[in-house]
């Protein structure tokens, strides 16, 4: 009798534990696939592929914890913003590129506000939390389709992330852009790790009014402005990055505005046309720049 009672109790405990995540509102993790060969949950054909990717991202937004996996090798044609919602991961296989489509009307301008700086990757619905972007190449198509665009005029950003709490970007390459690779504003708890920015059109990482951002283990090849730009940032870290130039550009680290608790260390700045670190109209509290390697700058 005692064994039977213990067995019944054990079964009841197991059943209770299996229901706890749903009771507590836990996420159901799953992966849905987007492909270019017809084998995915959503299938693209190399033209206006943002339509199918956004369908997958819309499903993910309604099902927190979902990963949208872009299968490769394949180049996805992006003629509209990819809109990422909360608790969503956008990830790529090896050989995956999302590439700005040709012949698009102008996205953004020097006169546009940050919120109006339309980009290849943006936040769905005005705000989000716990967003991850991993393991893909973002190609801004500047030399291919938009050679007439003047670099640094706020046109065709690769990513504009506004009002996001909890953002991780890892293993992503941003290349051949017309303006910023990553413009992040009014956001918090941002991690940028092992990213490559190769010849974007303005800043590699532009953080404006951000609370908590780390940029690490990344490589920046400037051609228009700075590798990393902290403007009105609290709790910002830049460490173990390499910053250089393709023949133009500005600083490795550009500091502006009200800055509090900033650290830049372990970085390798070399062959930049100006000083490695530049301050423009800053008001600083606890800004520490130390143990960086600087060669042939400014």
Identify the meaning behind each predicted range.
Residues 57, 121-125:
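Leucine-rich repeat
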Residues 60:
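Hydrophobic pocket-lining residues that define ligand/cofactor binding sites across diverse proteins
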Residues 64-110, 117, 138:
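N-terminal extracellular ligand-recognition/capping segment immediately after the signal peptide
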Residues 104, 126-227:
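Right-handed parallel beta-helix
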Residues 1-26:
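Secretory targeting signatures
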Residues 25-55:
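Right-handed parallel beta-helix/beta-solenoid
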Residues 78-80, 94, 99-104, 142-148, ...:
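Short glycine/acidic-rich loop motifs that flank beta-strands on beta-rich extracellular proteins
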